[in-house]
Amino acid sequence: MLTLVAVFGCTAVAAADLVVIVNPGSGVRSMTRDEVAKVFMARYRQLPSGTTALPMDLGPDSLERKDFYMRLLGKQLPDINAYWARLLFSGRASPPHQVANSAAAVDAVAENKGAIAYIDKRQVDTRVRVVLELDD
């Protein structure tokens, strides 16, 4: 039994601390969970500063992606994928752009004024601004 606790304890420690980042030139200093959710679900097309939003998703097999949607919306990836399938079919919206990993997300956000992404907190650097921390 102690072994199981140790294994599960390690898994919990290994889960990434996620943060939402934007370009420092976006004019955004912080965002609420609700604002971030609306940007990533295409309900808001702009960041709070009025800059056109360019949300970035990590790859479909990314653990950070799974954790992000669970922490932010309480939804599993199949639910998120079904949501986007409906919106794509109706022509109402397109899903966020995909990048390979947190490092690529940082690069994309640093290069695009309206970009917004979620990453492993350990990947944050001076080229981006953290606007929300997502705790377990």
Where in the sequence are the language-model features?
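Exported/periplasmic ABC-transporter solute-binding proteins
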Residues: 16-136
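Sec/Tat signal peptide C-region and signal peptidase I cleavage site
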Residues: 10-16
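Bacterial N-terminal signal peptides
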Residues: 1-9
